[in-house]
């Protein structure tokens, strides 16, 4: 049993080296996805405004510009790993609002029918945002460079 615990501890230590490369991959992929969705919204702002109007979102034109900018610039910030936790928070909130307004049925069926929640469009974006919010950007990020420069832990 002692050997098994030692091997487990050793394996866990080695696997922990994958944390930063994994977070980099998450940030690069999902950051790019956010950039693309934001860019698409920016170039179809009248459609997005109309869609927001159909969902009874207040100030639809303002919110169309706000959401498209948040997704585009938030995606860029994720890619470079700057202000990652704050960006993750804003993007996660954005995805929760997307659930609430566009996929409300999926959101309220979280416990009764989780499959509906998981297959809704905002899910993977929400999950990636929460990962960055909770785990941070990792070592391969501007956040880590700033933290080293300021001698603080991220």
Show which residues each predicted segment covers.
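Extended, low-polarity transmembrane helix blocks
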Residues: 1-43, 61-69, 73-154
């Amino acid at each position: 049993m002692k050997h098994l615990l030692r091997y487990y501890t050793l394996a866990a230590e080695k696997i922990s080296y994958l944390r930063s490369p994994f977070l980099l991959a998450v940030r690069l992929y999902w950051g790019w996805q956010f950039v693309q969705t934001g860019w698409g919204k920016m170039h179809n702002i009248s459609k997005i405004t109309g869609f927001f109007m159909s969902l009874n979102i207040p100030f639809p034109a303002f919110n169309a510009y706000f959401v498209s900018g948040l997704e585009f610039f938030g995606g860029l910030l994720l890619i470079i790993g700057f202000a990652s936790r704050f960006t993750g928070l804003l993007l996660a909130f954005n995805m929760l609002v997307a659930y609430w307004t566009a996929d409300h049925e999926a959101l309220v069926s979280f416990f009764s029918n989780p499959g509906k929640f998981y297959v809704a469009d905002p899910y993977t974006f929400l999950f990636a945002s929460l990962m960055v919010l909770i785990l941070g950007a990792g070592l391969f990020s501007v956040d880590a460079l700033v933290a080293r420069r300021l001698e603080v832990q991220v």
